């Protein structure tokens, strides 16, 4: 298993950034070989997104990547919700959806088709996984979103001086744009769904999951109902769990074989 730490200059973020790449390209003699059907089809690529306060660390077991023959790309989205902010150097959505994908294509020959390109995340990264696949449906074929921080309806109600203890009004405005306009903007996954449907475009495969004791469960249920109302095919799963790696680990073990098997 190759573990690479890469530094590159990002024009979207106007600085040098670091990210991790895990590639199952060095089979070991002391473990069973990869099944021929996975080796023969070529390596797929999973872009893996962290949550609020997180960074570029891999949280998908490497043995799954080795078994199903997929590379894992783990960038850092800081606390920017994986979308394009207002300030110069804050195009985190374009960095992930365009710049980083193109870098992986030209450097490693990976992620060449949407069928071979996946995005997965939890919490803020779950929002990012869903939003990114909908914003770049010709690039990402599958989105897996765990315990997603689908907070745009809350952001829409924020006014100057707002502070919920996690972040203040200025932070949310920087990430999402003017709160009063966020519901109609492309930073709202619901808006992206409606636009794709109106244009007759194929939507990515969507997989969502949330723990029944998670503080974000109602937000995820609302998105599930919205997708049902829009007749958007998707997988939605609930199980006992809170907002933690125990539940997200269950999601990975349950759905990675479905996604890559």
Q: How should each PLM-predicted stretch be described?
A:
Residues 1-261:
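Non-catalytic cap/lid and distal C-terminal segments of serine-dependent acyl enzymes
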């Amino acid at each position: 298993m190759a573990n690479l730490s890469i530094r590159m200059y990002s024009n979207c973020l106007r600085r040098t950034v670091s990210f991790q790449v895990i590639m199952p390209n060095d089979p070991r003699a002391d473990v069973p070989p990869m099944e021929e059907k996975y080796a023969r089809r070529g390596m797929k690529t999973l872009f893996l997104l962290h949550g609020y306060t997180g960074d570029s660390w891999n949280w998908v077991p490497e043995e799954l990547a080795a078994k199903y023959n997929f590379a894992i790309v783990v960038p850092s989205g800081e606390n920017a919700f994986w979308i394009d902010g207002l300030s110069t150097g804050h195009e985190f959505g374009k960095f992930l959806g365009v710049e980083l994908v193109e870098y992986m294509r030209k450097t490693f020959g990976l992620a060449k088709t949407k069928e071979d390109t996946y995005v997965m995340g939890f919490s803020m990264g779950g929002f990012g996984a869903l939003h990114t696949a909908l914003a770049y449906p010709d690039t990402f074929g599958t989105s897996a979103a765990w315990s997603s921080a689908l907070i745009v309806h809350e952001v829409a109600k924020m006014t100057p001086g707002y502070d919920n203890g996690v972040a203040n009004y200025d932070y949310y405005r920087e990430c999402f744009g003017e709160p009063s306009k966020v519901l109609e903007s492309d930073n709202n996954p619901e808006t992206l769904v409606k636009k794709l449907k109106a244009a007759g475009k194929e939507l990515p495969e969507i997989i969502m999951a949330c723990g029944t004791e998670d503080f974000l469960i109602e937000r995820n249920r609302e998105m599930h109902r919205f997708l049902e109302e829009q007749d958007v095919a998707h997988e939605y799963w609930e199980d006992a769990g809170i907002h933690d790696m125990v539940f997200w680990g269950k999601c990975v073990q349950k759905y990675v074989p479905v996604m890559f098997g």
